[in-house]
């Protein structure tokens, strides 16, 4: 479990009023802010801090999103004939919405060139 602390008493004056994250499972402390002697984000064994007294600091943990490469997939569930008919008869499909490069757009609001491009990219004969 991670606990946020502010050191209120320490033999080492550089630690006084410093802020740390204590990882009780690993027996480590990560420096958040200190006057001197410790760098921001430096991780040390808790026993390296020596004899200390501290008060717990409430923490708000926000989920972290990590993106490591990855893929992007747009899925449009319809038939090629539907889009081709929408090109010829847009009045029949005023609400036809498709995904294009990560956003939703009404098919009829695209230019004719964009519509042809969507049809060409969306439907393939094989992978």
Swiss-Prot record:
GO annotation, cellular component aspect: cytosol
Pfam families associated with the record: Gly_radical
Modification Glycine radical, positions: 102
InterPro entries hit by this protein: Auton_GlycylRad_Cofactor (IPR050244), Form_AcTrfase_GR_CS (IPR019777), Gly_radical (IPR001150), Glycyl_radical_cofactor_GrcA (IPR011140)
MF (Gene Ontology): formate C-acetyltransferase activity
Keyword Transit peptide in annotation: no
Keywords, ordered alphabetically: Organic radical
SUPFAM superfamilies registered for this protein in UniProt: PFL-like glycyl radical enzymes
Domain Glycine radical: 5-127
NCBIfam families: spare_glycyl (TIGR04365)
Function of the molecule: Acts as a radical domain for damaged PFL and possibly other radical proteins.
HAMAP family: GrcA
UniProt name for this protein: Autonomous glycyl radical cofactor
UniProt source species: Citrobacter koseri (strain ATCC BAA-895 / CDC 4225-83 / SGSC4696)
Source species taxonomy: Bacteria, Pseudomonadati, Pseudomonadota, Gammaproteobacteria, Enterobacterales
Gene that encodes the chain: grcA
